[in-house]
Regions:
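C-terminal substrate-binding/catalytic lobe of Rossmann-fold NAD(P)-dependent dehydrogenases
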Residues: 134-140, 149-292, 296-315
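Glycine-rich Rossmann-fold phosphate-binding loop(s) that bind the pyrophosphate
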Residues: 11-12
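Rossmann-like NAD(P)(H) cofactor-binding subdomain of soluble oxidoreductases
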Residues: 89-155
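Rossmann-like NAD(P)-binding element
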Residues: 54-115
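Aromatic pocket-lining residues of Rossmann-like dinucleotide-binding sites
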Residues: 22
Length: 315
């Protein structure tokens, strides 16, 4: 039986938490840690191995160069500059492109032919860049995109309505960043449209200030960043969920950034929308029927991604 092996490129706060989340949840057998700081990568591997006695599954962690990641089933790209509280995600593009220029030839040299889960910011632009310069099958590149934003949206709605977030279906779409939008016409509570519940049970489901809710969701990551210097647990859990869906061929519908090829009238970029995740990666993309206003907002968000994807090519 083939063991599941995941490589982590960038073993700082985020990458190390992804690795440990995979180990704790039993979604990996082997971890391969890679970082420009080789001592850190080795230390992260040692730390995980020290925890194995208290994990209910066998996990082996090693560290080494990117050129030796060819036998990994999945690569998690989490390398890049440290987050800056006063910097928009898009402003980190220059530093991230420099990392990509170093990493991509080394991935090619390794012979790696698996799946790539990209979680570095700016998420959608990085995934678009990786797909183009690796000349990869776009179905096999998934960016976490708005997976975490959508979780924050569900959390915020659950708080407002005093109801379990597990009963709420709600997505942030488009860019993982300032231009993200919410298709409010597709928000459901246990399968029932929120707009209907607001009419039938206004005491439980009051009218929302959509702009304020979305602003609170967008600022959520910055609150975490201000308090502890980085976001770790949320993105690690979201990444683990994506990898689980691939390894177990779950055919699970998750919000993530995937390659658009005509959906919503957009193509040639990665942007977030619900997608079916299974053993081939992105198996299908759910193109939601958006209102005219929602579609305009989604397209505005895609325009931001496209602008910075073009900019990345000039750096």
């Amino acid at each position: 039986m083939k063991l599941r092996k995941v490589g982590i490129i960038g073993t700082g706060h985020v990458g190390s938490h992804v690795a440990f989340s995979l180990a704790l949840q039993g979604e990996v057998d082997e971890l391969y840690m890679m970082d420009i700081d080789e001592k850190k990568a080795k230390a992260q591997a040692m730390d995980i191995n020290d925890a194995v006695s208290y994990i209910p599954h066998k996990v082996t962690a090693t560290a080494g160069p990117i050129e030796s990641c060819g036998d990994c089933d999945v690569l998690v790209f989490s390398a890049g500059p440290l987050p800056n509280l006063y910097q928009d995600r898009l402003e980190s593009l220059g530093d991230t492109v420099e990392v990509l220029k170093d990493v991509i030839p080394r991935i090619k040299k390794s012979g790696f032919d698996g799946f790539i889960i990209s979680i570095s910011n700016p998420a959608d632009v990085v995934a678009t860049y990786l797909c183009k310069h690796l000349n990869w099958n776009p179905k096999r590149i998934i960016s976490s995109g708005t997976a975490l934003d959508s979780a924050r949206l569900q959390k915020e709605l659950a708080r407002i309505f005093n109801i379990s977030n597990r009963t709420i279906t709600a997505y942030c779409l488009g860019e993982h960043g300032g231009s993200a939008m919410v298709p409010w016409s597709h928000v459901y509570v246990q399968g029932k449209p929120l707009v209907e519940l607001q009419q039938e049970l206004p005491h439980r489901f009051p009218t929302l200030d959509h702009t304020q809710v979305l602003d609170d969701v967008k600022i959520g990551g910055y609150h975490v960043l201000a308090g502890k210097g980085s976001t770790e647990f949320g993105i690690a859990s979201a990444t683990t969920e994506l990898i689980r869906a691939v390894f177990h061929d779950e055919k699970k519908v998750l919000p993530c950034s995937c390659y658009l090829d005509g959906q919503y009238g957009e193509e040639g970029i990665f942007a977030s929308t619900p997608a079916v995740i299974g053993k081939v990666g992105i198996e299908d993309i759910f193109e939601l029927k958006l209102t005219e206003e929602e579609l305009a907002l989604f397209k505005q968000s895609c325009a931001v991604i496209r602008e910075y994807a073009h900019k990345a090519e000039t750096l």
